[in-house]
Amino acid sequence: MKLLSEKATCNSHGQDSSYFLGWQEYEKNPYDEIQNPKGIIQMGLAENQLSFDLLESWLAQNPDAAGFKRNGESIFRELALFQDYHGLPAFKNAMTKFMSEIRGNRVSFDSNNLVLTAGATSANETLMFCLANQGDAFLLPTPYYPGFDRDLKWRTGAEIVPIHCSSSNGFRITESALEEAYLDAKKRNLKVKGVLVTNPSNPLGTTLNRNELELLLTFIDEKGIHLISDEIYSGTVFNSPGFVSVMEVLIEKNYMKTRVWERVHIVYSLSKDLGLPGFRIGAIYSNDEMVVSAATKMSSFGLVSSQTQYLLSCMLSDKKFTKKYISENQKRLKKRHAMLVKGLKSAGINCLESNAGLFCWVDMRHLLSSNNFDAEMDLWKKIVYDVGLNISPGSSCHCTEPGWFRVCFANMSEDTLDLAMRRIKDFVESTAPNATNHQNQQQSNANSKKKSFSKWVFRLSFNDRQRER
């Protein structure tokens, strides 16, 4: 007789993904400038550590908030007791106003429609429980965040059907890709309950444009399904074009009095924009009262501590601080992004043009020994074990094209990033002859075929020639 549940013993958590395996290898041999200078540098973790000094400065200037005081009087006992799981009103108001500020105050949010969760991971899973039954499917554009295989599927039993996007158009979402994914789900006898997108994208570091957002809204309207817009990177946009929230497009296109209004749900957190993943601050925003009610009840399994809510309600209510923080943080992200792009370019490596996020989508297709995912994994292993950099292979993000990698840049010092760039440049230079020989061999084979072809091509009809190509 089995003593453990099927959920406890199943292998569907996704922990065997190369995304998580890279973390494990880093933890075995972490880089340290003094203690372990040849260790693995963590470039597979999307953390924003660039503006901690701004947060620390605010805390030093506001000892009451950090010391759980109000007007000099301790409120420790008040915060230590059970709180309403709807969340502290002061924090929810501060959170919705901060969300508006991140979006340039072009849209406003009602705190009554906000559900607090212990991070965006909890928010996304809670929405799955609210919107899908076991075996139902959500469509996700590829490449997507590897953790979604765990967050959306493991405990809920929901399925993910990929919307295959291509580098030919910068991995943009197209109508044909949406329809193909929908039909694929139907062929697999899966009931499609919605589409989930990250905007800005993880791992691409790009923002969805208005055309894509309008396309998504039209699609979910026609199919009668939901849209989840994960906007946890909305405050990390450091270059044009600017960030456009799906809420803006809903209002611009007058969806307020349609069924679509209640079928669009936003996920947000302070992990990326404010660099506080350890504080576990996430949120669901929905115009559907039933979703808000159900998600609020479920949030009792992953509450945000009252102490954290009080501290951050004070911080986010300081508009002078939030304005300075948003601006300065974006400047620092822009500088660090440019440093990574320049370093990779000096090594002969290009990136997808991006304007947001804490990472770049890096093109290493020319370094593959062959054009397949086995070669991608071989290259990834060399970069992790030989070069000493933990980066995320595109296959872990369900990219359909081998040779792409996500590389993070905001979770380390400039000196560490500079060292990482020197390591990758040395690696490319040491392997360049092999890569060149591989390319030359391919070209030689192609030329040989062309010469052979020319000897008897006159015998073929035009149609035969077309088929040969």
From Swiss-Prot:
Belongs to the class-I pyridoxal-phosphate-dependent aminotransferase family. This is 1-aminocyclopropane-1-carboxylate synthase 3. Residues 432-452 are annotated as: Disordered. It comes from Solanum lycopersicum. It catalyses: S-adenosyl-L-methionine = 1-aminocyclopropane-1-carboxylate + S-methyl-5'-thioadenosine + H(+). Pfam families: Aminotran_1_2. Keywords: Ethylene biosynthesis, Fruit ripening, Lyase, Pyridoxal phosphate, S-adenosyl-L-methionine. Pathway: Alkene biosynthesis; ethylene biosynthesis via S-adenosyl-L-methionine; ethylene from S-adenosyl-L-methionine: step 1/2. GO terms for molecular function: 1-aminocyclopropane-1-carboxylate synthase activity; pyridoxal phosphate binding; transaminase activity. It comes from the Eukaryota. Induction: By flooding. GO terms for biological process: amino acid metabolic process; ethylene biosynthetic process; fruit ripening. The modification N6-(pyridoxal phosphate)lysine is found at K272.
